[in-house]
Regions:
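Phosphate/Mg2+-binding loops and adjacent switch elements
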Residues: 82-173
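Conserved beta-strand segments of the P-loop GTPase G domain that flank and frequently precede/overlap
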Residues: 9, 37-38, 121, 167-172, ...
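C-terminal lobe/tail of nucleotide-utilizing enzymes
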Residues: 159, 163, 174-266
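Switch/connector loops and helix/strand junctions flanking conserved nucleotide-binding motifs
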Residues: 44-47, 63-66, 126-131, 177-178, ...
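Glycine-rich nucleotide/cofactor/substrate-binding loop typically near the N-terminus or early
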Residues: 52-82
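Short, surface-exposed connector motifs at secondary-structure boundaries
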Residues: 25-33, 163-167, 213
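Walker A/P-loop NTP-binding active-site region of P-loop NTPases
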Residues: 6-64, 132-136
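Phosphate-binding P-loop
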Residues: 1-3
Length: 266
């Protein structure tokens, strides 16, 4: 895998956090230098520690201070600016600006360490669109100068070559897949090169679901299996990967099992 920044996004409740943690665990177990990032939210520390998943925590205001400190040459002055009501309000009134600052922080880490891979548990699909679209919008606003040059560097990383891979996570319903396809088209329109649709919580993708076991399913599950099988067949050209519905006692068990699918052992 050549991507340095692997993004998981999608509607709420599709399982992008589970998949992004499983991807991170898989890369770690294969010997990669990898960090899990939950954008501007803090991860489940207990879960990450239990699975020994390394994580990078970013907070919006701290990232803004760090960025200004790099430009001004003084962390103290940057902190003073951040504390002014105007700048603090501006940062929260323009969410796209905050997205750019955090994305810039991630890219800076990746550029400083060529061995590093970051798996991003992205905000929900609407915020993820803002995150990538904002690089174009703010570039038009500024036109030239220091921030304009930083945006150029950011876009070179995001939209040139194969450094970024975006996984649009969807559930196995026709409507959800249509929405995922629209989201994929939007990301490609922004300039992203590698955008995949991955299906999660798929009943037919359970390895143990043999024809003999399918025949023993209760009627409602048998119907669900048939519908999902038809959906997978109808959209097979659009779906890059499918992940099974898992019944485990804990999220940690599900992450550990799903990591095997990323590693190719399933």
């Amino acid at each position: 895998m050549s991507a340095r920044l692997i993004v998981f996004t999608g509607k709420g409740g599709v399982g992008k956090t589970t998949l992004s943690l499983a991807q991170t665990l898989s890369l770690k177990e294969s010997g990669k230098n990898v960090l899990y990032n939950n954008f501007d939210q803090f991860p489940n520390y207990g879960l990450c520690d239990r699975l020994r998943i390394p994580h990078l925590d970013l907070e919006l205001e701290e990232s803004a201070v760090e960025y200004m400190a790099q430009k001004l040459g003084s962390h103290m002055i940057a902190g003073w600016i951040m504390k002014t009501p105007f700048f603090s309000s501006l940062l929260h009134m323009l969410p796209g600006l905050g997205h750019i600052i955090i994305m810039g922080h991630l890219i800076n880490r990746l550029e400083k360490d060529p061995t590093l891979t970051i798996v991003m548990d992205s905000p929900s699909s609407g915020h993820a669109m803002t995150m990538f679209e904002s690089t174009h919008n703010f570039k038009k606003i500024f036109g030239s100068g220091m921030l304009f040059n930083d945006l150029n560097r950011m876009q070179d990383f995001l939209f040139s070559g194969d450094k970024v891979s975006v996984n649009v996570v969807t559930l196995p319903t026709e409507m959800a897949i249509h929405e995922a396809s629209e989201l994929k088209s939007a990301f490609l329109g922004f300039g992203l090169q590698d955008v995949k649709i991955v299906m999660n919580e798929s009943l037919p993708s359970i390895p143990e679901m043999t024809p003999e076991r399918v025949a023993l399913l209760p009627e409602f599950l048998s119907k669900k299996y048939q519908i999902e099988s038809q959906i997978i067949e109808s959209f097979k050209s659009e779906i890059t990967n499918t992940f099974p519905h898992l019944v485990n006692e804990s999220m940690a068990e599900s992450i550990t099992e799903l990591a095997k699918y990323f590693g190719g052992s399933k």
